[in-house]
């Protein structure tokens, strides 16, 4: 998984400063963080709706969850790129949480 994310991050970095007329990623960056966040929110909502439909759905509705989640991850990576946060920081944070009870991890965050 991280190889695919690394490849995508490289493509996003290359397209960040491309011509907004020829690159969707460059166009998002040119429109600024608020537009990127709008897209992340939109894709999050679409993912939630697809998941709700898929709960008792068929393979097509389950595939819609996969497609919408891919859109959400993509736009989240664009957001990270815009903020100059390497996707590896997120992967490192997930790795750090392995072996830690979810309840303990949540309690530690709340005590900060």
Swiss-Prot record:
Q: In which pathway does it act?
A: Amino-acid biosynthesis; L-histidine biosynthesis; L-histidine from 5-phospho-alpha-D-ribose 1-diphosphate: step 2/9
Record's GO cellular component terms: cytoplasm
CDD domains, per the entry: NTP-PPase_HisIE_like
Q: Tell me, what is one Gene Ontology molecular-function annotation carried by this entry? A: ATP binding
Localization annotation: Cytoplasm
**Keywords assigned:** Amino-acid biosynthesis, ATP-binding, Cytoplasm, Histidine biosynthesis, Hydrolase, Nucleotide-binding
Query: EC number(s) for this protein?
Result: 3.6.1.31
Major localization class: cytoplasm
What InterPro entries does the record point to?
Answer: HisE, PRib-ATP_PPHydrolase-like
Query: Which chemical reaction does it catalyze?
Result: 1-(5-phospho-beta-D-ribosyl)-ATP + H2O = 1-(5-phospho-beta-D-ribosyl)-5'-AMP + diphosphate + H(+)
Q: Which domain of life is it from?
A: Bacteria
Which GO biological process entries does UniProt record here? L-histidine biosynthetic process
**Assigned protein family:** Belongs to the PRA-PH family.
Q: Which NCBIfam families match?
A: histidine_hisI, PRK00400.1-3
Name of this chain's protein = Phosphoribosyl-ATP pyrophosphatase
Q: Which organism is it from?
A: Chromohalobacter salexigens (strain ATCC BAA-138 / DSM 3043 / CIP 106854 / NCIMB 13768 / 1H11)
């Amino acid at each position: 998984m991280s190889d695919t994310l690394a490849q995508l991050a490289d493509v996003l970095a290359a397209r960040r400063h491309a011509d907004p007329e020829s690159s969707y990623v460059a166009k998002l960056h040119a429109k600024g963080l608020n537009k990127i966040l709008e897209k992340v929110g939109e894709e999050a909502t679409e993912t939630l709706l697809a998941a709700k439909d898929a709960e008792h759905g068929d393979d097509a509705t389950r595939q819609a969850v996969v497609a919408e989640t891919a859109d959400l991850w993509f736009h989240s990576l664009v957001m990270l790129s815009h903020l100059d946060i390497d996707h590896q920081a997120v992967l490192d944070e997930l790795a750090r949480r392995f072996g830690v009870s979810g309840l303990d991890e949540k309690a530690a965050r709340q005590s900060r």
